[in-house]
Amino acid sequence: MSSGGLLLLLGLLTLWEVLTPVSSTDRPEFCELPEDSGPCKGLFHVFYYNSDQNQCLEFIYGGCYGNANNFKAIEECKRTCAA
């Protein structure tokens, strides 16, 4: 296969990966955790996955501790947790 064909195949596989939603069986367990602002007093606008509403929602993160269900960008939250 030519290098152009391999590049096209790689591009198509990457596109498929980005566009394929996460199924609930593939979703990481931390996506089920509740939002957790943590004890610090920062005001960081971040996102968490709300498993009851099946969507990523914004919340204010204090900047320390909290849990893994915490994303800087909604796209990252959707890619990781949303089905």
Swiss-Prot record:
Compartments, record wording: Secreted
Tissue expression: Expressed by the venom gland.
Positions of the record's site feature: Reactive bond for trypsin: K41, G42
InterPro entries reported in the protein's UniProt record: Kunitz_BPTI (IPR002223), Kunitz_BPTI_sf (IPR036880), Prtase_inh_Kunz-CS (IPR020901), TFPI/VKTCI-like (IPR050098)
BPTI/Kunitz inhibitor domain segment(s): 31-81
Record keyword Plastid present: no
Gene Ontology molecular-function annotations: serine-type endopeptidase inhibitor activity
Keyword terms of this UniProt record: Disulfide bond, Protease inhibitor, Secreted, Serine protease inhibitor, Signal
Record-linked Pfam families: Kunitz_BPTI
Residues making up the signal peptide according to the UniProt record: 1-24
Superkingdom per UniProt: Eukaryota
Main location: secreted
Disulphide-bonded residues: C31-C81, C40-C64, C56-C77
PROSITE patterns named in the record: BPTI_KUNITZ_1, BPTI_KUNITZ_2
Family statement: Belongs to the venom Kunitz-type family.
Protein's job: Serine protease inhibitor.
Protein name as annotated: Kunitz-type serine protease inhibitor vestiginin-4
